[in-house]
Amino acid sequence: MIHSLPSPEPFVILAMPRTGTHYLEALLNDHPNILSNGELLNSYDENWPDKDRLRHSDRELLELAYMRYPPAKKKVTHVGCKINEPQFYERPGFFDELARWQGLKVILLTRNTLESLRSLVQARQTGQWLKFSPDRNEPPSVSLSVNECEAYFKAADDFHARVKDAFDPSKLLMIEYQDLLLKPSACLAAVLAFLGAPAHRFSNRATIQRQETRSLARSLRNFVELRRHFAGGPYAKFFELDDASAPQG
């Protein structure tokens, strides 16, 4: 169905993989007027009843996201979805179509890129992408090659630059993963103000759990080797953070 005018204001959450987008979306969906419908370009996302939607054109997909979105049991004034960087490779023209969508506001979620890559490799190895209940099982420690680190770091830099170049600064809000986990109430308030949605008290009802609580030095088997290789370069910052007490996952 096409929802009656006035249409909800559109937004999108953009990020590299494993940067806390599920957690941010859970916080937003707790708001009585905000609806975020998961990964538009993920054919397995259960938010979308149309399992054949990826056969549609880019424009039709965006109309599905912002005009024909799944019904919700609340008055929706802001509607959105999220897209991870690798999903744009499968639809080369989709980013430009997204950038042309009138009135779109963009939330760019960022994270220490080394943490993002380590978490991605762990999830691929275990097949566990989300964790909804606490347990004592730790994800496996992993090793990363210099080449895969360099490729991933560059992909993240290029993606962040592309987003910043494509959208007016007034339509773009950047949120850091660590701030989201350590200061969720303040981050949520900033996002709501950016979207123009009414203030809403942080409820802490999100059930998503951190999968990795160890530092990079403990969860990455060749951390010292990689830190030595990248020392003095533009990516040294990913190894210099004191993340021993920072939430991760």
UniProtKB/Swiss-Prot annotation:
<keyword id="KW-0808">Transferase</keyword>
<dbReference type="InterPro" id="IPR000863">
    <property type="entry name" value="Sulfotransferase_dom"/>
</dbReference>
<dbReference type="GO" id="GO:0008146">
    <property type="term" value="F:sulfotransferase activity"/>
</dbReference>
<dbReference type="InterPro" id="IPR052796">
    <property type="entry name" value="Nod_factor_sulfotransferase"/>
</dbReference>
<dbReference type="InterPro" id="IPR027417">
    <property type="entry name" value="P-loop_NTPase"/>
</dbReference>
<protein>
    <recommendedName>
        <fullName>Nodulation protein H</fullName>
        <ecNumber>2.8.2.-</ecNumber>
    </recommendedName>
</protein>
<comment type="function">
    <text>Required for the formation of sulfated nod factor. Proposed to transfer activated sulfate (PAPS) to a N-acetylglucosamine of the nod factor.</text>
</comment>
<dbReference type="Pfam" id="PF00685">
    <property type="entry name" value="Sulfotransfer_1"/>
</dbReference>
<keyword id="KW-0536">Nodulation</keyword>
